[in-house]
A protein has these predicted regions:
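Amphipathic, membrane-inserting segments
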Residues: 73, 88, 93-101, 105-108, ...
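Intrinsically disordered, low-complexity segments used for protein-protein interactions
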Residues: 7-11, 15, 21, 82-84, ...
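Short N-terminal edge-element motif at the start of the domain
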Residues: 104, 109-124
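Alpha-helix boundary/N-cap detector
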Residues: 4, 50, 54-57, 119, ...
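Charged, low-complexity surface segments at secondary-structure and domain boundaries
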Residues: 43-48, 112-118, 137-138, 231
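Generic structural signal of hydrophobic/aromatic residues within well-ordered alpha-helices
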Residues: 5-10, 59-63, 128, 132, ...
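Membrane-inserting effector segments that mediate pore formation, membrane fusion
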Residues: 121-173
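An N-terminally focused, membrane-permeabilizing/fusogenic/translocator signature enriched
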Residues: 1-93, 256-264
């Protein structure tokens, strides 16, 4: 009994005893737990917050409001992500917790997603024509063999070939292709499409406009026409748009460190 009491007293005396280490450490019995009283203070010791911003402007405003010495911005092209750590390490001798963070993922625009989703996807002439008609606003004013109005007229002409049998395709010197078809009622005719289309489009929502070319492809089998398009180097357009976003941040956010990299 006495020995048990002595052991309990010794345990009580040892509990909470500081140890001689580089990292502040205390010896704590399993029968005890350490409780922080920070929640009862007037304000927290440091900011512990993670937010996701939904626009470039919101990100710029937030970083400018909370940035401190050592704040770091990490840009990840692969994920189209921008991560900010406000209480990042000032240098090797001044580590910090990194508890206050902000993230922004560059969102694709509705138009870009529409063209990307249909990229290299085979369609019949009616489906292809309807897609172009619904997205005629994306046709660039410059750089095309035909104007947007001319392309729309070509697209509408394809609607008349619903029951036609396609025979051949001829490439013309003006940069268009002529599709010859036969029809029981009209006897047949020709419809045209450009070999290549130049788009003027925003890769990111509310971002800058970029031009990207799309090659028009076709296949005729048993009188049926299949059409599709192939975007030319879309990844380069995305990379350029992402780099432009980073440059905007550098222009509008001073005295922070920028790094190309991902948080792991």
């Amino acid at each position: 009994m006495e020995q048990s009491l002595v052991n309990d007293i010794a345990l009580q005396l040892a509990n909470g005893k500081a140890l001689n280490t580089d990292i502040p450490t205390a010896l704590v019995s399993e029968a005890f737990h350490v409780t922080s009283l920070e929640a009862y203070q007037k304000e927290p010791v440091r900011i512990r917050q993670a937010v996701e911003l939904k626009s470039e402007t919101a990100l710029i405003d937030y970083v400018n409001k909370f940035k401190v010495e050592g704040t770091a911005v990490f840009s990840d092209l692969d994920e189209l992500a921008i991560n900010v750590i406000f209480d990042y390490h000032r240098d090797a001798g001044q580590p910090r917790w990194g508890n206050h963070r902000a993230a922004y993922h560059c969102p694709f625009s509705k138009d870009w997603k529409g063209w990307q989703d249909k990229n290299k996807q085979a369609m019949n002439q009616i489906e292809f024509g309807l897609f172009l008609e619904n997205n005629i606003h994306c046709i660039a004013a410059e750089g095309n063999a035909v104007s947007g109005a001319e392309l729309l007229a070509m697209v509408l002409a394809f609607e008349e070939t619903r029951k036609s049998e396609f025979k051949s395709v001829q490439r013309l010197q003006d940069g268009t292709m002529s599709f010859a078809f036969a029809d029981e009622q009209s006897g047949g005719g020709k419809a045209r499409l450009p070999e290549e289309i130049t788009l003027g489009i925003q890769p990111f929502r509310n971002g800058d406009f970029y031009q990207i070319k799309a090659r028009v492809r076709y296949r005729i089998k048993d009188g049926a026409l299949t059409l599709w398009y192939e975007l030319i180097n879309p990844e380069k357009v995305i990379e350029s748009a992402f780099n432009s976003t980073i440059e905007k941040l550098k222009t509008n956010i001073a005295n922070v460190d920028f790094y190309e990299g991902a948080l792991i």
